[in-house]
Every structure is written in structure tokens, then in C-alpha cells.
Amino acid sequence: MAEHIVKIISTDDLTHDVKRFRVEKPSGYTFVPGQATDLSVNTPELKNKKRPFTFTGLNSDPYLEFIIKIYPSHNGVTKELDSLKPGDELIVRDVWGAITYQGKGVFIAGGAGITPFISIFRDLESRDEIDGNMLIFANKTEADIIQPEEFRKMLGDNFINILSEEKLSKYPHGMISEEFLRSTVGNFNRKFYLCGPPPMMNALKGQLASLGVGKEALTVEF
């Protein structure tokens, strides 16, 4: 597996626990929107401590972008990433990933599971092909929603949020249920893209099966 040492160009806080990293792009390095790579911090102690992260930018960008949820309590790679600054080095490796765009459909994300969809939607918008897609984004609170303004601008009324902990009049409250899907999605004769925590994904697969969605219509990544 090829390894590329790249310098961090910039870091930005997007939410209380999510950061955007832009790093140098190796010559000739390409990916399909929705794909990921294994990243590590380029220090002797951490270079072999790899974790998967999804590309959130576009191939046309002069940098690679990653939007990463930080888990300080896990004492792992994201905690180390949180302390890095421009000029520090990461190692990026070959691309991989199960989620790629297969045609218009409904995208359902839980928390940091939104990241593969960011690149997909940005790519669709750049090609003026975003119409006909819907995004349902499940989070605990409004403060957890990643890139809400960007998704609202791209998708309008087809960007739907649901909050499981915080109750606000402008958002549905609770967990995604079969009833919620029935009232929100309407037409189930289309593709579904799912990414989020395994318990959520398992529940969604069961709910969608009950609503008549076949396995062939599902693209899933945990």
C-alpha cells in the first residue's frame, strides 16, 4: 500500500467536536466521492496507528480535505489530530470505500456518518446534478449538525434534520422510525444510501425492508 507524507495546510473548528483538515495533495492522487483512506500522524510513535477517514472535498481541489469528529475521551487518533497545527505531517494511503453514487435517492446519515455524503453532494452540485436527491440527517442536538448551511443551500427542503435529544420546534424530535420515513420519504421505489453507527444502520435496514425497499437498492457503510 502506497504511503504519502503530507503537510497540514489548515485546520478549522466546524462544531464543538468536529474539525476540518486540509492537507497537501500528492501528485496524481484521486478518489471517487464517498471514498476514504487510512490516515495516521507522521511521528515515530503514531505513524502506524491508522484510522479510516472519508474525503470531503473534490478531486478538483488543490488539497485533500477531511472533516473529522474528535473523540478526546477515546485517547486515540482523533485526540492526536485535534492537537495538530498547519505544518504538521500526516500519512495518507490508498483510497477505498463502499459508498459511491449510484443514482438519485435518499441519503440517511447519523452523526459523523455524514462525511461520505459531503463529497458526493459537493460533486453533484458541481455538475448541476443534485436535484432529485434527499438527505435525512440524525443528530443528538442542533449544535451537532455538520455543515447545515451548506446542505440547506444545496438541497433546500430536501435537507431534513431529526434530533434525538434536543427538542426544538423547527426539527422533528426522536429516533428515525418507520412512521417518520413513511411521512418524510413517501416514494420508496428509489435508491437509499445509509451511513452511521451500526445500531442505527441495522434498525434502518429493517425499517426500509418493511417499507418495501430491497437490498439491491441499499448502499450501506458503517
Which residue stretches match the model-derived regions?
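Ferredoxin-reductase
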Residues: 2-86, 139-141, 165-166
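N-terminal helix initiation/capping motif
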Residues: 1-2, 92
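FNR/FR-type flavoprotein reductase catalytic core
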Residues: 73-222
